[in-house]
Amino acid sequence: MRTRLLLFSCLVAIANPLMAGNPARARRPRLELRATPRMAFSPVLVFMTAELRGGEDSEEFYCPALVWDWDDGGRSVQEADCPPFASGNTVDRRFTAEHAYRAAGVYNVKVTLKRVHRSVAAATTTVYVRSVLGDPGESE
């Protein structure tokens, strides 16, 4: 009976990542999103860069689709160009997109990485667009 209890305890410790210090969480890549420019006058073409960095490559982050929510009613989907998968490599991937803003506003742009219809990472940044000085449509 003692042997069974000891074996059960060992299996629980291995199967539960919280008890094992959760090393998988420490190796999880992070997604960063940048806009260039972040502040501009309308109309403006904004270039976005999403970088997936750090952690070890895994099937979860291999060949994601990107969903861009431009916060102006527009949305676009981009399929990733996939390098050959090799387990244990460090993740360092860069994705780019561009979007034109024609109206003044504060836009919270969000990119979501999806794999097999499941979100695996997301990041948000803010873009500030002002009307041209002296534009009758600009309110003070």
List each model region and its residues.
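Extracellular/lumenal mature domains of secreted and surface-exposed proteins
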Residues: 16-140
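Sec-dependent N-terminal signal peptides
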Residues: 5-12
